[in-house]
């Protein structure tokens, strides 16, 4: 046993077996506390349903926070006595609610906001991947015939689906995994307990109905549960004699229902065979809320949902007090840090949940403002100790910089800084929890208030003019101590606060400066307040980041036409960090030295206040425009970074690189300029090749003439000797020597291809994101003009029908409008399709400084699936569509209708329009408070750094080994035998370090799971990175396991069709192939291929990558026919990408197809493809290029073989005709091949046959280029 562990023995636990010994033993760390022991007991079969019990050590009931090491003292073991404890109302309710979770009343789709939005299901298990077969890592694996058959079937299904559009049904998720094992379990109508029975220990009454329709009434008492004699019409809480009372409710239910235990076992078995990541309820995040939902919630009757609030005896929470109290906790160990982060993560999630619930109540007019006299966006609400205010320029604060538009930007920027503070965990300065909730076009800012700010301090009794006493509220004692005070419109200074804010300014690189003779270490727009708890709070942090002054000067200040909507354009935190890192690196200073240098800090008020400037702020803005944006885009165009799959991926890349989305227009213009440059460069190159080809043809003509002349002259000389009867001199018998100056050595051109998939793909994704954002702004603007949120679905359906339903019904109308509303008062209803399309162009120009063509809709229909734009709009505005067939043309509808059963066809009601308000619901779009685990991140960085260090050491060791081998081959001294033992020691040391690194990475993930729970977005990236680590080590089996986990979590956290999920599945396909599971790999590729139809433009390189990997897998099966089918599909895709232009990658692919046909002895098809390749190589590389000459030689060889085969066939026919009639070939025996030398040869062998042994290397090089277009 480790010295850091303690043996813990729990005695007296209930036993369900005949065994007398029911002791439970654990080895737990000394730093663990009693609550950890309770967690372990909750997984034991005998104690998992016990929620009310004491643990007694040395006759003392221990507290959950007691540390095991402190209880044990110098001892190495601890013994606890397990003792059930009497229930009270709170613990009884907790027991019942907890049991309901176990019994399946809470499905895997439920989270804290399920009443407002539908969560994403999972599809990963539906792929039915075969279990990991533990194939040997890195070694050759044998593929069974059965697996080959299944692979070929899946491969053919994928190939057949290539020319079909995205199928919306492919996103449907299966049935729920977690389903109730009871029909109902809720508090009965006889609650609350009458006073007479309260004295008898009764706490509450329950009613349970089994799946077999048996109903039982149950009494909950301090000693447990028993079935009583009550019925639906009679109250009698006395026990029924035939059933024994039980301490746990589940034991009672098992007793009264014969099939209940069977249902529970069935549910347990179902869950135990599934990864817990698929069904466990999230503890500190919300599940993904998809744009497409498979089905509407069943909403089975469950009284308990409405009853729980009544039995909730928790006092109203004060999130601010709790949040600040957590920061005050002492941290003396890693366990303390872990505990602190876990509490913080849970609190922040609970805050986000309450923020959403409160916001939705306000959106639905269910709450009263603090001042009942205010209405609309002027109203401020106080609910569950949180402040809710609409994001709008109500007081005119931002009127000079954009009004409401500026207010929207300020809210976003404030939240970004607050989330940075959540991560930093500063103690000297405090901040308020904040969230932003968007719903139906309106935005609410939710904050936990500064303590005392809204707390009434009493009233003054005054006498009014009529001599009546009136109670007048006293003003709060809390006011601004530092920074800008709105009430008096002046800047304030406080020495104590000035010192406290120093920690904040250092972390955000803010320069101390003067504004109106007041010294400040923060923005003059921010404010500092001492709460009644005497903690220093900082508010209004939006202007902490510097102004993007280059953008302001170009698009706002002194701009008269098409001015940007607001001046509140700031640089992102990522950009500031990157600028500072580069400046420090260039200076050669250490981080410690740089922290004291004013060269690396900035004035947050620069260019905010007239006349205030800062060189560093201007330099950062220039750095973004001149360096970061261009390097980021060039990185994508050069293939160093993947082209984004969709708008969300694009946004993630922009923000990670510190680029704001307002630069979308500039990004497209940059990409288009580079695209045009490549086109021109290619045109010049092709012109050069064309000229060189003419010169080569001229040389070839002259060369042939010269050779013919030499041959003729030689023949004439030989003839002279022959005519004279003399012996021909040996000199004349030798090969004719040509002048080297007359020869033309072959060249090797690289070609000049335009990366069409890179350029067109990036432009397409950027424009689609711009269009979707522009439409979101139109939706928001029009929604704000509506008198009721119930009208917003009408607006959404109307606009979607205008855009997408034109071919189904040109006369778009507002359907099913309630009689309370007048259609003539609805501004959106007056829009035409042309006006809407033009308005999108206006918004794109205004917000992204880009001129969309008036045909943008038609252009994007050619670039993407129709559903790509619908998806993008839905995600941004919070629309959840039902996954069903939508009809965009009459022809599509009639085809669908004819496919239905004849009996049903007559009952079908023709839809009036493509979309109806019954096809979707609206959900809140949440930008919540975020938290990151620093302790888990530190462990991860340590582990990853160690992995990288070991990898470098292994590369160096391998290099030395190769050098040693080379030296030995050259006859030099390769070193003494002692060197081998040294290498072995070094290898052992590296293995030890690697194990240590992997342990650190595993511990980091374990900490994340402890802090955030088993379902959280941070775990998705962690498991994916861990999978990549194991992949680098060649341990594919483990890599696949972790990648599977990442995929499952990604589906639940991000969605089944998110770019994160697609990226993970793409990795998984490679890993499955790497470990030899070709069927699994094909299944995953099939899923990726279908998702790419929805997410990405048709020209996206991800589609090419799917076929590349599929071809690699097919090659391992040695089925050349399926390989040919794959490459033919790839050729089709390459032509589609280039607009039918036959480019070099297409030629290389045709050459590969020719290889395969040759190996099948199908010379006619081989000739067809090699001729096509030769023609392309001639145009792209030149007639004198080695590749072109090789293909030409190959073509001639194949032609010769075909001619020979034809001659042999004629000869065989002639011989057959002369044979006696009774002599024939044996039935069923095929004639031997005419070209046995080529039959069934590999591609490399064929090239060696044609070109010699050097061919295979060049072939392999050419294969790598086939993705370039």
Swiss-Prot record:
Residues 1258-1269 have a biased composition (Basic residues). The keyword NADP does not apply. Residues 958-989, 1211-1269 are annotated as: Disordered. One of its GO terms (biological process) is mitochondrion organization. TPR repeats lie at residues 1020-1053, 1147-1180. One of its GO terms (cellular component) is cytoplasm. The keyword Cytoplasm applies. May associate with the eukaryotic translation initiation factor 3 (eIF-3) complex. mRNA-binding protein involved in proper cytoplasmic distribution of mitochondria. Belongs to the CLU family. This is Clustered mitochondria protein homolog.
């Amino acid at each position: 046993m480790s010295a850091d562990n303690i043996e813990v023995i729990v005695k007296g636990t209930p036993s369900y077996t005949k065994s007398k010994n029911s002791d439970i033993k654990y080895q737990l760390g000394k730093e663990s506390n009693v609550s950890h022991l309770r967690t372990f007991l909750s997984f034991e079969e005998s104690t998992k349903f016990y929620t009310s019990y004491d643990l007694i050590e040395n006759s003392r009931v221990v507290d959950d926070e007691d540390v095991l090491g402190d209880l044990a003292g110098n001892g190495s073991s601890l013994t606890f006595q397990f003792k059930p404890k009497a229930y009270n109302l709170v613990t009884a309710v907790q027991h019942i609610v907890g049991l309901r979770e176990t019994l399946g009343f809470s499905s895997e789709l439920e989270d804290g906001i399920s009443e407002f939005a539908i969560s994403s299901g999972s599809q990963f298990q539906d792929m039915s991947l075969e279990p990991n077969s533990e194939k040997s890592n890195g070694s050759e694996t044998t593929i069974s015939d059965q697996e080959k058959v299944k692979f070929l079937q899946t491969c053919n299904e994928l190939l057949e689906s290539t020319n079909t559009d995205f199928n919306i049904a492919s996103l449907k998720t299966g049935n729920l995994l977690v389903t109730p094992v009871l029909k109902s379990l809720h508090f009965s109508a006889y609650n609350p307990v009458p006073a007479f029975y309260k004295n008898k220990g009764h706490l509450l009454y329950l009613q349970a109905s089994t799946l077999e329709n048996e109903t039982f009434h149950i009494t909950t008492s301090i000693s447990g549960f028993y079935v009583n004699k009550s019925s639906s019409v009679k109250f009698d809480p006395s026990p029924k004699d035939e059933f024994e009372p039980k301490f746990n409710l589940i034991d009672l239910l098992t007793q009264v229902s014969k099939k209940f235990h069977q249902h529970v076992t069935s549910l347990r078995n179902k869950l135990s065979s599934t990864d817990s990541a698929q069904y466990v309820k999230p503890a500190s995040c919300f599940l993904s809320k998809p744009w497409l939902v498979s089905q509407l919630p069943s909403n089975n009757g469950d009284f308990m949902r409405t009853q729980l609030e009544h039995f909730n005896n928790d006092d109203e929470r004060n999130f601010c007090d709790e949040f600040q109290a957590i920061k005050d906790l002492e941290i003396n160990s890693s366990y303390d840090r872990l505990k602190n982060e876990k509490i913080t993560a849970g609190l922040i999630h609970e805050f986000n949940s309450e923020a959403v619930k409160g916001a939705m109540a306000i959106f639905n007019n269910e709450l009263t403002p603090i001042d009942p006299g205010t209405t609309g966006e002027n109203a401020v609400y106080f609910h569950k100790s949180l402040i809710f205010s609409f994001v709008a320029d109500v007081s005119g604060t931002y009127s000079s910089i954009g009004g409401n538009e500026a207010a929207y930007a300020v809210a976003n920027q404030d939240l970004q800084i607050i989330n940075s503070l959540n991560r930093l965990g500063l103690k000297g300065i405090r901040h308020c929890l904040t969230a932003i909730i968007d719903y139906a076009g309106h935005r609410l800012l939710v904050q936990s208030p500064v303590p005392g700010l809204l707390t009434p301090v009493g009233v003054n009794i005054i006498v009014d003019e009529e001599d009546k006493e009136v109670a007048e509220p006293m003003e709060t004692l809390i006011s601004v101590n530092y920074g800008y005070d709105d009430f008096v419109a002046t800047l304030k200074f406080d020495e104590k606060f000035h010192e406290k804010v120093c920690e904040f300014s250092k972390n955000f690189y803010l320069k101390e400066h003067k504004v109106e003779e007041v010294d400040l270490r923060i923005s003059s727009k921010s404010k500092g307040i001492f709460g009644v708890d005497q903690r220093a709070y900082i508010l209004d942090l939006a202007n902490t980041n510097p102004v993007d002054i280059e953008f302001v000067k170009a698009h706002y200040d002194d701009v008269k036409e098409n001015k940007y909507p607001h001046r509140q354009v700031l640089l992102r935190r990522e950009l500031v960090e990157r600028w500072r890192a580069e400046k420090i690196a260039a200076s050669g200073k250490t981080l410690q030295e740089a922290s004291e240098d004013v060269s690396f800090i900035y004035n947050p008020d620069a260019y905010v206040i007239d006349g205030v400037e800062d060189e560093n702020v201007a330099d950062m803005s220039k750095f973004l425009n001149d360096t970061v944006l261009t390097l980021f885009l060039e990185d994508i165009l050069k293939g160093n970074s993947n082209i984004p799959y969709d708008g969300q991926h694009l946004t993630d890349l922009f923000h990670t690189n510190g680029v704001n989305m307002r630069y979308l227009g500039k990004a497209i213009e940059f990409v288009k300029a580079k695209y045009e440059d490549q086109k021109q460069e290619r045109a010049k190159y092709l012109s050069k090749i064309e000229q060189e080809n003419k010169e080569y043809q001229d040389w070839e003509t002259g060369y042939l003439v010269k050779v013919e002349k030499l041959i003729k002259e030689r023949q004439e000389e030989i003839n002279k000797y022959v005519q004279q009867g003399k012996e021909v001199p040996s000199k004349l018998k030798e090969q004719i020597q040509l002048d080297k100056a007359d020869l033309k050595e072959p060249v090797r051109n690289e070609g000049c291809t335009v990366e069409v998939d890179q350029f067109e793909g990036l432009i397409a994704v950027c424009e689609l994101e711009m269009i979707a954002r522009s439409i979101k702004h139109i939706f928001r603007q029009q929604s704000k003009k509506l008198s009721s949120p119930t009208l917003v679905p009408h607006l959404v359906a109307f606009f979607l029908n205008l855009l997408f339903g034109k071919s189904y019904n040109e006369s778009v109308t507002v359907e099913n409008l309630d009689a309370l509303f007048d259609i003539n008062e609805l501004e959106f209803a007056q829009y035409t399709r042309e006006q809407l399309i033009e308005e999108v162009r206006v918004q794109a120009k205004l917000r992204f400084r880009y001129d969309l063509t008036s045909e943008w809709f038609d252009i994007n229909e050619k670039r993407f699936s129709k559903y790509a734009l619908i998806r993008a709009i839905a995600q941004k505005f919070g629309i959840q569509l039902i996954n069903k067939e939508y009809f965009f043309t009459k022809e599509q509808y009639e085809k669908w209708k004819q496919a239905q059963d004849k009996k049903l066809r007559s009952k079908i009601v023709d839809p009036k329009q493509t979309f109806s308000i019954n096809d979707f619901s609206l959900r809140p779009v949440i930008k919540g408070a975020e938290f990151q685990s620093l302790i888990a991140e530190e462990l991860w960085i340590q582990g990853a750094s160690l992995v990288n260090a070991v990898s470098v050491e292994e590369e160096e060791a391998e290099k030395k080994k190769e050098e040693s081998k080379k030296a030995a081959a050259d006859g030099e001294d390769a070193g003494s035998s002692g060197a081998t033992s040294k290498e072995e020691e070094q290898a052992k040391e590296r293995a030890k370090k690697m194990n240590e690194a992997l342990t650190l990475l595993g511990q980091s993930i374990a900490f994340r799971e402890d802090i955030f729970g088993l379902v959280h977005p941070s775990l998705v990236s962690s498991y994916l990175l861990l999978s990549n680590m194991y992949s680098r080590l060649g341990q594919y089996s483990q890599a696949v396991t972790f990648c599977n986990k990442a995929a499952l979590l990604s589906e639940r956290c991000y969605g089944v069709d998110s770019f994160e999920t697609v990226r993970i599945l793409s990795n998984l396909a490679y890993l499955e192939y790497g470990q030899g599971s070709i069927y699994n790999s094909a299944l995953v590729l099939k899923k990726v291929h279908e998702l790419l139809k929805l997410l990405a433009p048709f020209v996206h390189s991800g589609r090419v990558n799917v076929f590349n990997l599929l071809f690699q897998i097919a090659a391992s099966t040695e089925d050349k026919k399926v390989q040919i089918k794959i490459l033919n599909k790839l050729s089709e895709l390459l032509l589609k990408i280039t607009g039918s232009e036959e480019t070099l990658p297409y030629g290389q692919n045709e050459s590969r197809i020719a290889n395969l046909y040759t190996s099948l002895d199908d010379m006619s098809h081989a000739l067809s493809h090699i001729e096509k390749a030769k023609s392309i190589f001639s145009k792209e590389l030149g007639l004198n290029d080695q590749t072109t000459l090789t293909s030409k030689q190959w073509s001639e060889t194949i032609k010769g073989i075909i001619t020979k085969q034809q001659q042999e066939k004629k000869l065989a026919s002639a011989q057959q005709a002369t044979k006696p009639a009774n002599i024939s070939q044996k039935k069923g025996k095929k004639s031997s091949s005419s070209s046995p030398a080529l039959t069934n040869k590999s591609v490399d062998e064929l090239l060696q046959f044609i070109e010699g042994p050097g061919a295979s290397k060049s072939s392999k090089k050419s294969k790598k280029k086939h993705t370039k277009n």
